[in-house]
Amino acid sequence: MRVVDFLKIDDANGRNAWFLRVDPEDITITLRDIIDALSDLSWISQFDKSYLRATYQTRAEATVKHICQKIQEGAASGVYGDAAEYIVSEVARETLVEHLKYKNVPLGELFKEQVSGNPGFDFFTSNLSDIVIFGEAKYLAAKNAYGSGMSQTARFIEEKRDIADIADIQNFFSDSALTGVYDGTKGFAIAFSAKNTSSVTLIQNIRKNAHYENLASYSELIFVAVNI
């Protein structure tokens, strides 16, 4: 994977909005790396309590098997379908961890309690100021998916899904970071599949989106365009 663009897109009135564009380059290697990353459950060992380790192990093993099977099926057929949003989500998560040095928290589906329907945000991290970032990933086969990601993120905020997610993420973040979430000190990352549209045009369209002003009012807003 290669970060091809990293730009600050808005700093008016203290705003902190960023745009990254990631090119997976060799998709075969990228998919193999994603499967390896998902299969690495060493993060479970950080928890002192045996019952927590057992809980996360049980949740993660079945989910990893399911996701990896979807990715492998997509790689074999060239049609990624259900696997595509997992790919966008994991590429974005790894980019924030490796490029920005943000907190390495496993993909949400590996540790969150499974809920019917859409359970909430897809991935989580915190920045160097210990502010929790809630991540949403969207894939569309025919067009850039930033609009769908912004719309869903705005809806999740309105429905207080970020607050609801605190119960699932509390063991990965500090008390002060979680208190900040409740008090409004938090950020959002929107990862989306990108086509051949230039980054300049993507940024212009993102800033014109009806949800942009509200989303940019939070402590940090990050867009991660994934060329897939």
Question: Where on the chain are the PLM-derived regions?
Answer:
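Charged, terminal alpha-helix-loop-beta segments
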Residues: 1, 79, 99, 153-158, ...
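Interdomain/boundary linker segments immediately adjacent to catalytic/signaling cores
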Residues: 1-90
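A short acidic/basic microdomain associated with nuclease active sites
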Residues: 95-116
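Short loop/turn segments at secondary-structure transitions that flank enzyme active sites
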Residues: 98, 129, 140-143
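Short beta-strand or tight-loop elements
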Residues: 119-121
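Active-site beta-strand-loop-beta-strand hairpin of nuclease catalytic cores
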Residues: 125-134
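Catalytic cores of nucleic-acid endonucleases
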Residues: 137-197
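Domain-level recognition of nuclease-like catalytic cores that cleave nucleotide substrates
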Residues: 172-228
